[in-house]
Amino acid sequence: MPRADQSVDVAIIGAGPAGLTAAYLLTKQGYSVTVIEKDPTYVGGISRTVEMDGFRFDIGGHRFFSKSQQVVDLWNEILPDDFIQRPRMSRIYYEGKFYSYPLRAFEALWNLGILRSTLCMASFAKAKLFPNRNVRSFQDWTVNAFGHKLFSIFFKTYTEKVWGMPCDEMSADWAAQRIKGLSLWGAVVDGLKRSLGLNKKPNDGMETKTLLETFRYPRLGPGMMWEAARDFVVAGGNQVLMAHSFKQLAQDQGTGRWRMVADGPDGDVIINAAHVISSAPMRELAGRIHPLPATLPEAMDLKYRDFLTVALMVKGDDIFPDNWIYIHDSKVQVGRIQNFRSWSPEMVPDTSIACVGLEYFCFEGDGLWSSADADLIALAT
């Protein structure tokens, strides 16, 4: 039998960054809130930090950066004393060579060689003189911006790994958003300055995101931010129910209130709420609202790209100094490799052990997603 109704102002589906930010702000305003999270242990969603024997592993490590002062202020409020400033070092691995990312002009020219560098510049000139006027795809946009040769070297392979589809089938809008503010000329000028040691601009959050030299990071990984947000919500008298999966959502047409059912370890829990905030995938949400929405077929057709991280603990020094390395090699499936100590030294407490995370992009249910742990470890090593 379902447990007795919990009556709250707001019910929230998912204890990831979106759900916990909403819960945090609502708790500050004095609202009653219940959050449900299907993971039995960790909050933070894709931004969680997994712990084993004192070692910490980020599922999807990314630097903390925002041009919104409101967002930065919120981060500082949740974690007032736990951000550290880290030097950014990331590289691209392509055809057996490493390229600094963002590019360093002299290094890139040397690695590519005179012939290929000349072809890249000729390709760029051609794109500027004869641009594609009918830009529809990621490939169209990127070729127009950088030329076909640079597109094929530094964009095509990695992007297709991430999204699992050809670049000429991806929207140009995504390219404009993801690579906004970055041009070949800007990258070359910035690369020249850094190659000569002349780039001394402070990391004030107002430079092009792709060119940032340093970044802020929670000292124990991003998961500690969402753990702190959860603790604040609970300390404020609200609930974060772990190991509770979203099951059903229906609205009372008379009162306008919502009846949400969650499946927990001890059976169903019913939450009665004036409002509901969902951070669940749209397919899951649409399929569990009753009555079913008219747009259900469209919602169920939405596709999501999934990924998994294979974390390895290796005896010895760090394998590389970078925060992460992009693998632009179509011969291997891995897309990015993280160095957890380079994110924060406190995440790897034993200096005799190196910890890396190999990221693989896949679709839920495909061969990679369904692989046994032993097979994934073998693939990663």
Segments predicted by a language model, with ranges:
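Feature captures the FAD/FMN-dependent oxidoreductase FAD-binding
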Residues: Q70-Y101, A145-S152, F232-V240, K247-W258
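Dinucleotide-binding Rossmann-like beta1-alpha1 core, especially the glycine-rich loop
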Residues: D53-F130, D140, Q177-K180
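Glycine-rich FAD pyrophosphate-binding loop
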Residues: T27-V50
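Active-site/ligand-binding neighborhood in enzyme catalytic cores
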Residues: L119-A122, K126-A250, G256
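A general beta-strand register signal
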Residues: E51, D58, Y93, L241, ...
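Conserved Rossmann-like nucleotide-cofactor binding loop
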Residues: A18, T41, R283
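Mid-domain catalytic core of redox enzymes
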Residues: D5-Q6, Q29, H244-A372
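N-terminal Rossmann-like FAD-binding beta1-loop-alpha1 element of flavoenzymes
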Residues: V8-V35
